[in-house]
C-alpha cells in the first residue's frame, strides 16, 4: 500500500505531498491520493490513485531519472506529444502530466492515465476461460483503435498483449506509444529498436527499409493467435530463429513471396531454409471459429503487400456482428511526430516542460525559471 512520508530533508514543495511505494518515493500533486502500486517496469512504477477534485480513479506512472538515458527520454517525449492529440475509446487517455517544481533540473516525470484493471498478457496467461465472443470483442477493439491510429498516419510499432490494457467490462485500450512513428518517415530509424521480437513482422526481421501500417497488422495477427491458443505463436529466441518459426508455420516461401525483400543477405537466408509445407492454422487452433482462422490467415501473410489492411480486417465476416463503418470516424488531422533524434537532454527537458503546460494553463511563465 501507499505510505505517506515526510519530504526528503524535511523540505516539501508547495502543492506536493510524499508517499513511498515499493521503496520508491512519489512526490505528487496534493489533489491525487495514491492507493497502491499496481505495476513495475524498466521505466519505473505505476500506482492507482484517486483524483480528489473529480473523485475519479486514475493510474500514476512515475518515470524515474528520465534523462539518464537520452533514447528513453526521447521515447517519453514522443509519447507525450502523441497522446495529447489522440482521442479514441480504444486508445489510453493521458489525463495529466504533473508539473515539476524546477523547470531546468527536474529528473522524474509523473504521468496520469485513466485506470484500467489489467492487460491482455495477464488475461492470456490466467486460467480464465476465453470464449469466441471474448476473442472477437478484444480483436474488434484492437482493430478499431488501430484504424484510428493509422488514419492519423501513426504506426504503433510495438503492439503486444502487455500493451493492451483491459478493464472488468472487457474494454480494451492500446497503450505505450514510445516507439510510435508517422508513416512518412521511411528507413530513418534502427529497425532493431522496434516491436518486441515475437510480434515483429517479417519485413522488420529482414531489415527492409520500406515498411508501413502492415507491420502493425502482423502484430495483431500474432496477438489474435495468442488469444486463440493461450501461448505465443512465434516465440523466437533471436532474429533468425524468429524467421524460422514463422516459415515453419506458414510454409516455404515462393519466389513471388520474397520479392519484396530488398536486402540480398536476408533474401539468401530465407532461400536456405529447408523446405516445409507449413502447419495448418486449423490444426493449431482446432477449437477456433472457422471465420477466425480465415481472418488470422489473412493477417499472417509473409509479404506485407498481400497482408490484409486494418479496414479490410474490420470488414471481414468474422467482425460483422460488431463492426459499424459509420461508428469509426478517422482522426481529425494527421499528427506530426517529427522529433530530431539527435536532440540534447536539455532540449528534450524543455520540450517536455512545454508538453506539460498544455495540461496546466494556470502555470504562469516566469515561475521557477
UniProtKB/Swiss-Prot annotation:
Tree of life domain: Eukaryota
Activity regulation note: Activated by threonine and tyrosine phosphorylation.
Binding site for ATP: 38-46, 61
Positions carrying Phosphotyrosine: 193
Domain Protein kinase: 32-319
Motif (TXY): 191-193
An example Gene Ontology biological process: intracellular signal transduction
Summary of the tissues where the protein is detected: Expressed in leaves and panicles.
Coiled-coil positions: none
PTM statement from Swiss-Prot or TrEMBL: Dually phosphorylated on Thr-191 and Tyr-193, which activates the enzyme.
Protein name in UniProt: Mitogen-activated protein kinase 4
Organism of derivation: Oryza sativa subsp. japonica
Lineage: Eukaryota, Viridiplantae, Streptophyta, Embryophyta, Tracheophyta
